[in-house]
């Protein structure tokens, strides 16, 4: 993407072909001399944060210190859970099938109705805690059979395996605590980027 910049203002943006549809270039590529003569500059991009943690919205192309820059708005996602509500602010509930609901004469019974369980919009802390638990469960699943064997037949779990499993559980607990203590999205991202799961020996 390029921009034509004249008198400290962007007058047009697009590809070279879009900006100069009637001009042909040797080798099909505009050289730097042409770009300079026509006041063409490459568009650079402002910061785009990790979209796991931020809602990223593309904005306008603006001049920043004379450089055409594609702007982005990075809005942090919500950390905590919140009640799900409709457009009028009414609480939403998890729906269940009521097989006995009477729909009137000549109609089959049954309807989806509200339960007493609130519908919740999960925040990042809940989402990341679930991911951490899933990782721990996946790592432990490989040796769960040894735990079952120990319980059912009293066959000892190898010490290396016991140490590994304990380390997985410890790391999971550490991460859950750190996630819960994260004060903002950047702190939460730092926790998730610093996961230190043990390696099997």
What are these regions (language model features)?
Residues 1-141, 148, 173-201:
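Interaction-interface detector
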Residues 150-157:
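Exposed beta-sheet edge/beta-hairpin loop segments within beta-rich domains
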Residues 152, 169-170:
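Short Gly/Pro-enriched loop/turn and capping motifs at secondary-structure junctions
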Residues 157-166, 188-189:
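Short, charged, amphipathic alpha-helical segments
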């Amino acid at each position: 993407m390029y921009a034509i910049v004249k008198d400290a203002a962007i007058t047009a943006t697009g590809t070279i072909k879009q900006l100069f549809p009637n001009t042909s270039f040797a080798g099909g590529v505009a050289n730097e001399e042409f770009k300079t003569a026509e006041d063409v500059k490459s568009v650079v991009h402002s910061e785009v944060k990790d979209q796991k943690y931020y809602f990223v919205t593309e904005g306008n192309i603006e001049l920043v210190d004379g450089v055409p820059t594609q702007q982005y708005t990075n809005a942090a996602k919500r950390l905590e859970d919140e009640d799900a509500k409709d457009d009028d602010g009414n609480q939403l509930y998890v729906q269940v099938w009521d097989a006995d609901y009477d729909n009137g004469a000549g109609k089959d019974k049954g309807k989806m109705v509200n339960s007493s369980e609130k519908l919740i919009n999960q925040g990042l802390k809940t989402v990341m805690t679930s991911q951490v638990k899933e990782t721990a469960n996946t790592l432990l699943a490989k040796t769960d059979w040894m735990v079952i064997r120990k319980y059912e037949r009293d066959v000892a779990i190898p010490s290396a395996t016991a140490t590994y499993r304990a380390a997985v559980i410890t790391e999971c607990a550490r991460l859950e605590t750190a996630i819960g203590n994260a004060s903002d999205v950047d702190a939460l991202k730092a926790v998730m980027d610093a996961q230190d799961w043990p390696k099997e020996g």
